[in-house]
Amino acid sequence: CDIVREYDTGNYYGWRVATRLGGAATIHIVYLLGIGAMIEALLHGWRRWISVPVLTILLVVLVLSGSRAGIVGVGLFAGMLVLWYAQRRLHTLKARAALVTTVLLAVCAAVVGMSLMRGSLVDRARVLTWRTAWHAATTDVATVLFGVGYGRLWPWLGGMTGALPLRSHAVRTTFFGASLPHAHNTVVAVFGEMGLVGLAALLVIFGVVIVVAVRAVRGPSRVLAMTILASLPGLLVDTYLIKNFPVSLLWWVAVFMLLVLEAE
């Protein structure tokens, strides 16, 4: 319904599907979590007449979002599902190695296909943005440690609220240099604005999440753990968790659900 409303009001960016919950570059996180929930429902035989259509819709809108990170995430999630399903039936090392190779090739094919459609995962605009962030964050010892300050390199909230004229998605000249409206990389965003201290905190947080999720893959919460793991590579090509708060909130809810389930 949200997607239909966006198109009805003309609030969209080119052909890419976006919603008020999140833009085309980040909404794939919500779709990926929903896909995981529907897969879990199918594995438990829960109302397939609902699960199958919803799963199909989520896959379609994810592709229509044009998110390269979303395609990679779904590919990784599907690969992990296939490996989990097959390891229960493949008993030889040779067979498992062949399966792993096949899954990796399929993921690579998905990346290549998306690159042919929309260009490479890393385009010139992102390179310029990351270079600007590097120069800004390495001007002196203080900025290396603490960054230039949250919201200074990329005042995205000002653009969203209309306080600043930052509606365009194109590269613009800023006080620090040429840059997109946001970093298109969560790691770069944290380092550029919060320095090594912020980056260390980010790595600790995600280190804990990865350890818990990897352990959970072997238990009953494996599908939820796989969706969380599959969402992490997108951090390198898009910015979320420190912006796009509705999408980030849903991701953190999923993470805390996994933590609670594992604690029990």
Model-based region annotation:
Residues C1-Y13, T19-Q87:
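Alpha-helical transmembrane segments of multi-pass inner-membrane proteins
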Residues M38-W46, G79-L90, G207-V217, F256-E264:
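Structural signal for the C-terminal ends of transmembrane alpha-helices
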Residues L64-S65, A78, V82-V141, Y150:
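A membrane-periplasm/extracellular boundary helix in multi-pass inner-membrane enzymes
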Residues E193-S231:
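Hydrophobic transmembrane alpha-helices and their immediate junctions
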